[in-house]
Protein backbone atom coordinates (compact mmCIF):
# COMPACT_ATOMS: atom_id res chain seq x y z
CA UNK A 1 0.00 0.00 0.00
CA UNK A 2 2.76 2.42 -0.83
CA UNK A 3 1.39 5.88 -1.52
CA UNK A 4 4.03 6.24 -4.21
CA UNK A 5 2.79 3.48 -6.50
CA UNK A 6 1.24 4.75 -9.74
CA UNK A 7 -1.96 3.09 -10.92
CA UNK A 8 -0.81 2.94 -14.52
CA UNK A 9 2.24 0.96 -13.42
CA UNK A 10 0.04 -1.44 -11.47
CA UNK A 11 -2.36 -1.93 -14.36
CA UNK A 12 0.49 -2.52 -16.79
CA UNK A 13 2.45 -4.82 -14.47
CA UNK A 14 -0.43 -7.11 -13.55
CA UNK A 15 -1.85 -7.09 -17.04
CA UNK A 16 1.48 -8.33 -18.35
CA UNK A 17 1.63 -11.01 -15.65
CA UNK A 18 -1.84 -12.45 -16.31
CA UNK A 19 -0.89 -15.15 -18.85
CA UNK A 20 1.64 -16.89 -16.62
CA UNK A 21 0.30 -15.85 -13.23
CA UNK A 22 -1.14 -19.19 -12.11
CA UNK A 23 2.16 -21.00 -12.61
CA UNK A 24 3.89 -18.84 -9.97
CA UNK A 25 1.02 -17.97 -7.61
CA UNK A 26 1.28 -20.82 -5.10
CA UNK A 27 1.56 -18.40 -2.17
CA UNK A 28 -1.52 -16.52 -3.32
CA UNK A 29 -3.51 -19.75 -3.38
CA UNK A 30 -2.34 -20.73 0.12
CA UNK A 31 -3.22 -17.34 1.51
CA UNK A 32 -6.60 -17.21 -0.24
CA UNK A 33 -7.58 -20.58 1.19
CA UNK A 34 -6.56 -19.46 4.68
CA UNK A 35 -8.47 -16.20 4.30
CA UNK A 36 -11.71 -18.10 3.73
CA UNK A 37 -10.88 -20.60 6.48
CA UNK A 38 -10.56 -17.70 8.92
CA UNK A 39 -13.44 -15.55 7.66
CA UNK A 40 -15.90 -17.77 5.84
CA UNK A 41 -18.86 -16.60 3.80
CA UNK A 42 -21.90 -15.82 5.93
CA UNK A 43 -24.99 -17.80 4.91
CA UNK A 44 -27.08 -14.69 5.52
CA UNK A 45 -24.96 -12.32 3.44
CA UNK A 46 -26.11 -10.72 0.22
CA UNK A 47 -24.02 -10.27 -2.90
CA UNK A 48 -20.30 -11.02 -2.61
CA UNK A 49 -17.38 -9.23 -4.25
CA UNK A 50 -13.82 -10.39 -4.92
CA UNK A 51 -11.83 -7.17 -5.04
CA UNK A 52 -8.62 -7.46 -7.04
CA UNK A 53 -9.65 -10.89 -8.26
CA UNK A 54 -6.59 -11.57 -10.42
CA UNK A 55 -7.04 -14.78 -12.40
CA UNK A 56 -9.95 -15.87 -10.23
CA UNK A 57 -8.67 -18.34 -7.62
CA UNK A 58 -10.61 -16.75 -4.75
CA UNK A 59 -13.50 -16.02 -7.10
CA UNK A 60 -13.92 -19.75 -7.65
CA UNK A 61 -13.91 -20.47 -3.92
CA UNK A 62 -16.50 -17.76 -3.32
CA UNK A 63 -18.64 -19.00 -6.20
CA UNK A 64 -18.79 -22.42 -4.55
CA UNK A 65 -20.08 -20.85 -1.33
CA UNK A 66 -22.40 -18.23 -2.82
CA UNK A 67 -25.60 -20.32 -2.84
CA UNK A 68 -27.06 -18.51 -5.87
CA UNK A 69 -26.15 -15.05 -4.59
CA UNK A 70 -24.53 -12.61 -7.03
CA UNK A 71 -20.73 -12.74 -7.13
CA UNK A 72 -18.74 -9.79 -8.46
CA UNK A 73 -15.12 -10.08 -9.57
CA UNK A 74 -13.27 -6.78 -9.90
CA UNK A 75 -9.74 -6.00 -11.05
CA UNK A 76 -7.90 -2.98 -12.40
CA UNK A 77 -6.12 -5.09 -15.07
CA UNK A 78 -8.36 -6.28 -17.91
CA UNK A 79 -6.16 -9.30 -18.82
CA UNK A 80 -6.59 -10.60 -15.27
CA UNK A 81 -10.37 -10.37 -15.59
CA UNK A 82 -10.23 -12.15 -18.94
CA UNK A 83 -8.23 -14.98 -17.38
CA UNK A 84 -10.75 -15.26 -14.53
CA UNK A 85 -13.69 -15.25 -16.93
CA UNK A 86 -12.11 -18.12 -18.88
CA UNK A 87 -12.26 -20.22 -15.69
CA UNK A 88 -15.65 -19.09 -14.45
CA UNK A 89 -17.73 -17.96 -17.45
CA UNK A 90 -21.07 -18.27 -15.63
CA UNK A 91 -22.35 -17.00 -12.30
CA UNK A 92 -19.88 -14.11 -11.94
CA UNK A 93 -20.23 -10.45 -12.90
CA UNK A 94 -16.85 -9.12 -14.05
CA UNK A 95 -15.98 -5.45 -13.60
CA UNK A 96 -12.74 -3.70 -14.62
CA UNK A 97 -12.39 -1.07 -11.91
CA UNK A 98 -10.16 0.78 -9.48
CA UNK A 99 -10.70 -0.45 -5.91
CA UNK A 100 -10.65 3.12 -4.64
CA UNK A 101 -13.53 4.15 -6.94
CA UNK A 102 -15.91 1.22 -7.15
CA UNK A 103 -18.62 1.49 -9.85
CA UNK A 104 -21.15 -0.26 -7.60
CA UNK A 105 -24.38 0.89 -5.98
CA UNK A 106 -24.53 2.04 -2.38
CA UNK A 107 -25.25 -0.73 0.15
CA UNK A 108 -25.52 -3.35 -2.59
CA UNK A 109 -23.10 -5.96 -1.19
CA UNK A 110 -23.15 -8.22 1.83
CA UNK A 111 -19.46 -9.15 1.86
CA UNK A 112 -16.24 -8.02 0.22
CA UNK A 113 -13.19 -10.29 0.03
CA UNK A 114 -9.75 -9.47 -1.29
CA UNK A 115 -6.69 -11.70 -1.50
CA UNK A 116 -3.25 -10.04 -1.70
CA UNK A 117 -4.49 -7.13 -3.80
CA UNK A 118 -5.26 -4.16 -1.57
CA UNK A 119 -1.58 -3.54 -0.80
CA UNK A 120 -1.35 -1.99 -4.26
CA UNK A 121 -3.87 0.72 -3.37
CA UNK A 122 -2.28 4.10 -2.66
CA UNK A 123 -5.14 5.77 -0.78
CA UNK A 124 -6.33 3.74 2.21
CA UNK A 125 -8.98 6.25 3.34
CA UNK A 126 -10.52 6.25 -0.15
CA UNK A 127 -10.35 2.46 -0.35
CA UNK A 128 -11.97 1.80 3.02
CA UNK A 129 -14.49 4.60 2.51
CA UNK A 130 -15.70 3.25 -0.82
CA UNK A 131 -15.83 -0.34 0.44
CA UNK A 132 -17.98 0.87 3.32
CA UNK A 133 -20.24 2.75 0.90
CA UNK A 134 -21.04 -0.31 -1.21
CA UNK A 135 -21.64 -2.65 1.76
CA UNK A 136 -25.02 -2.95 3.43
CA UNK A 137 -25.20 -2.21 7.18
CA UNK A 138 -23.57 -5.09 9.03
CA UNK A 139 -21.66 -6.13 5.92
CA UNK A 140 -18.18 -7.64 6.19
CA UNK A 141 -14.87 -6.66 4.63
CA UNK A 142 -12.29 -9.46 4.81
CA UNK A 143 -8.89 -9.32 3.16
CA UNK A 144 -5.33 -10.57 3.22
CA UNK A 145 -2.52 -8.15 2.51
CA UNK A 146 1.25 -8.01 2.76
CA UNK A 147 2.72 -6.51 5.93
CA UNK A 148 6.06 -4.73 6.45
CA UNK A 149 7.80 -8.01 7.32
CA UNK A 150 7.50 -9.12 3.69
CA UNK A 151 10.73 -9.86 1.80
CA UNK A 152 12.93 -8.61 4.63
CA UNK A 153 15.81 -10.73 3.32
CA UNK A 154 15.62 -9.12 -0.11
CA UNK A 155 15.45 -5.65 1.46
CA UNK A 156 18.53 -6.38 3.56
CA UNK A 157 20.45 -7.72 0.57
CA UNK A 158 19.70 -4.67 -1.58
CA UNK A 159 20.64 -2.38 1.32
CA UNK A 160 24.18 -3.73 0.97
CA UNK A 161 24.27 -2.50 -2.64
CA UNK A 162 22.76 1.02 -2.64
CA UNK A 163 20.28 3.33 -0.92
CA UNK A 164 17.40 3.01 -3.40
CA UNK A 165 14.15 1.28 -2.50
CA UNK A 166 14.17 -2.02 -4.40
CA UNK A 167 11.33 -3.74 -2.52
CA UNK A 168 7.74 -2.56 -2.26
CA UNK A 169 6.82 -0.96 1.07
CA UNK A 170 3.75 -2.22 2.93
CA UNK A 171 1.86 -0.71 5.87
CA UNK A 172 1.52 -2.26 9.31
CA UNK A 173 -1.49 -3.80 10.99
CA UNK A 174 -1.63 -0.83 13.38
CA UNK A 175 -1.87 1.59 10.45
CA UNK A 176 -4.63 -0.49 8.86
CA UNK A 177 -6.54 -0.63 12.15
CA UNK A 178 -6.34 3.16 12.52
CA UNK A 179 -7.48 3.75 8.95
CA UNK A 180 -10.42 1.36 9.31
CA UNK A 181 -11.53 3.08 12.51
CA UNK A 182 -11.21 6.52 10.90
CA UNK A 183 -13.42 5.34 8.02
CA UNK A 184 -16.16 4.18 10.42
CA UNK A 185 -15.55 0.42 10.49
CA UNK A 186 -15.95 -1.53 13.73
CA UNK A 187 -15.13 -4.88 15.34
CA UNK A 188 -11.82 -5.02 13.49
CA UNK A 189 -9.82 -8.23 13.65
CA UNK A 190 -6.21 -8.31 12.40
CA UNK A 191 -3.95 -11.36 12.57
CA UNK A 192 -0.35 -11.46 11.34
CA UNK A 193 1.20 -14.65 10.05
CA UNK A 194 4.58 -15.16 8.39
CA UNK A 195 4.91 -17.56 5.47
CA UNK A 196 8.27 -18.78 4.17
CA UNK A 197 9.05 -19.91 0.65
CA UNK A 198 12.22 -21.60 -0.56
CA UNK A 199 14.08 -21.25 -3.84
CA UNK A 200 17.05 -22.92 -5.46
CA UNK A 201 18.53 -19.52 -6.29
CA UNK A 202 17.87 -15.83 -5.70
CA UNK A 203 17.18 -15.50 -9.42
CA UNK A 204 14.20 -17.84 -9.00
CA UNK A 205 12.70 -15.51 -6.39
CA UNK A 206 13.19 -12.52 -8.68
CA UNK A 207 11.49 -14.35 -11.57
CA UNK A 208 8.56 -15.24 -9.32
CA UNK A 209 8.12 -11.62 -8.25
CA UNK A 210 8.03 -10.55 -11.87
CA UNK A 211 5.70 -13.42 -12.76
CA UNK A 212 3.07 -12.37 -10.22
CA UNK A 213 3.41 -8.70 -11.15
CA UNK A 214 4.86 -7.82 -7.75
CA UNK A 215 8.30 -6.56 -8.71
CA UNK A 216 9.33 -3.11 -7.51
CA UNK A 217 6.51 -0.63 -8.24
CA UNK A 218 7.56 2.20 -5.92
CA UNK A 219 7.77 5.61 -7.56
CA UNK A 220 11.05 6.23 -5.70
CA UNK A 221 12.65 3.09 -7.11
CA UNK A 222 15.87 3.35 -9.06
CA UNK A 223 15.19 4.34 -12.65
CA UNK A 224 16.97 2.54 -15.44
CA UNK A 225 18.18 -1.05 -15.58
CA UNK A 226 19.99 -2.74 -12.73
CA UNK A 227 23.56 -3.50 -13.75
CA UNK A 228 25.00 -7.00 -13.69
CA UNK A 229 27.44 -5.89 -11.00
CA UNK A 230 24.64 -4.59 -8.77
CA UNK A 231 22.64 -7.77 -9.25
CA UNK A 232 25.71 -9.91 -8.52
CA UNK A 233 26.41 -7.97 -5.33
CA UNK A 234 22.79 -8.27 -4.19
CA UNK A 235 22.76 -12.02 -4.78
CA UNK A 236 26.01 -12.41 -2.85
CA UNK A 237 24.58 -10.38 0.04
CA UNK A 238 21.38 -12.46 0.03
CA UNK A 239 23.31 -15.72 0.06
CA UNK A 240 25.42 -14.44 2.96
CA UNK A 241 22.22 -14.04 5.00
CA UNK A 242 21.29 -17.70 4.59
CA UNK A 243 22.58 -20.22 7.17
CA UNK A 244 22.76 -22.98 4.57
CA UNK A 245 22.41 -23.42 0.82
CA UNK A 246 18.67 -22.72 0.85
CA UNK A 247 17.31 -19.38 -0.35
CA UNK A 248 14.39 -18.40 1.88
CA UNK A 249 11.97 -15.49 1.50
CA UNK A 250 9.62 -14.31 4.25
CA UNK A 251 6.13 -12.95 3.65
CA UNK A 252 4.20 -11.25 6.42
CA UNK A 253 0.50 -11.72 5.74
CA UNK A 254 -2.09 -9.63 7.56
CA UNK A 255 -5.54 -11.21 7.71
CA UNK A 256 -8.06 -8.44 8.32
CA UNK A 257 -11.80 -8.37 8.97
CA UNK A 258 -14.06 -5.45 9.81
CA UNK A 259 -17.79 -4.74 9.76
CA UNK A 260 -19.76 -1.80 8.43
Describe the function of each predicted region.
Residues 2-33:
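Class I SAM-dependent methyltransferase Rossmann-like catalytic core
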Residues 110-123:
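A short SAM/SAH-binding and catalytic strip from SAM-dependent methyltransferases
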Residues 26-46, 61:
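Conserved alpha-helix/loop element of class I SAM-dependent methyltransferases that forms part
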Residues 47-102:
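Class I SAM-dependent methyltransferase SAM/SAH-binding core
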Residues 125-137:
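A short glycine-rich, Lys/Arg-flanked "PGG" loop and its adjoining helix->strand segment in the class I
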Residues 100-111:
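A short acidic, Gly/Pro-enriched loop at the edge of an enzyme's catalytic core
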Residues 138-202, 212-223:
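Conserved catalytic/acceptor-binding region of the Class I
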Amino acid sequence: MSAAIAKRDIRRSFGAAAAGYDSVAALQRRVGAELLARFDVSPAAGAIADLGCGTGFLTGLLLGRAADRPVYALDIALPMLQAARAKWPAGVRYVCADAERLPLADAGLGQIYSNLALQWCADLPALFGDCRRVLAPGGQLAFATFGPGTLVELKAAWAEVDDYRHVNAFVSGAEIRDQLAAAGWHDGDIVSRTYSTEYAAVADLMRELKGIGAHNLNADRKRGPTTRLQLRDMIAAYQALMPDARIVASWEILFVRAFR
